[in-house]
């Protein structure tokens, strides 16, 4: 009896590009909303403003919730931050002092 794994695994034949495109179309509608980018400059500006307002409102709500929670707790809340990006990570770790 042979021991170990087989050297050459059996593979399915690769789909042609037309078959792959056809299966993509037959998959059906996807979940979630779709946003079509507007072409008119005024509409682009309105959407940008709307997005910035939504972000600002969300941040304000999160800040208020954190402040309310931290005031009711006897111990100080420790907030977790997202990990730094690769470029900033090296600079951030070198500037921190051990405590």
Swiss-Prot record:
Positions of transmembrane segments: none
Segments forming a coiled coil: none
InterPro entries with a match to the protein in the record: UPF0390
Chain segments carrying region Disordered: 1-36
Alphabetized Pfam families for the sequence: DUF2462
Function according to Swiss-Prot or TrEMBL: May have a potential role in hypercalcemia of malignancy.
Family of this protein: Belongs to the UPF0390 family.
Descriptive protein name: Leydig cell tumor 10 kDa protein homolog
This protein's encoding gene: C19orf53
């Amino acid at each position: 009896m042979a021991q170990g794994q087989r050297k050459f695994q059996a593979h399915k034949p690769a789909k042609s590009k037309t078959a792959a495109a056809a299966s993509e179309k037959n998959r059906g509608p996807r979940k979630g909303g779709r946003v079509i980018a507007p072409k008119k400059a005024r509409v682009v500006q309105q959407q940008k403003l709307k997005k910035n307002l939504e972000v600002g409102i969300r941040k304000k709500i999160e800040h208020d919730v954190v402040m309310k929670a931290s005031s009711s707790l006897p111990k100080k809340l420790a907030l977790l931050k997202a990990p730094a990006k690769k470029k900033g990570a090296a600079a951030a770790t070198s500037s921190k002092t051990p405590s």
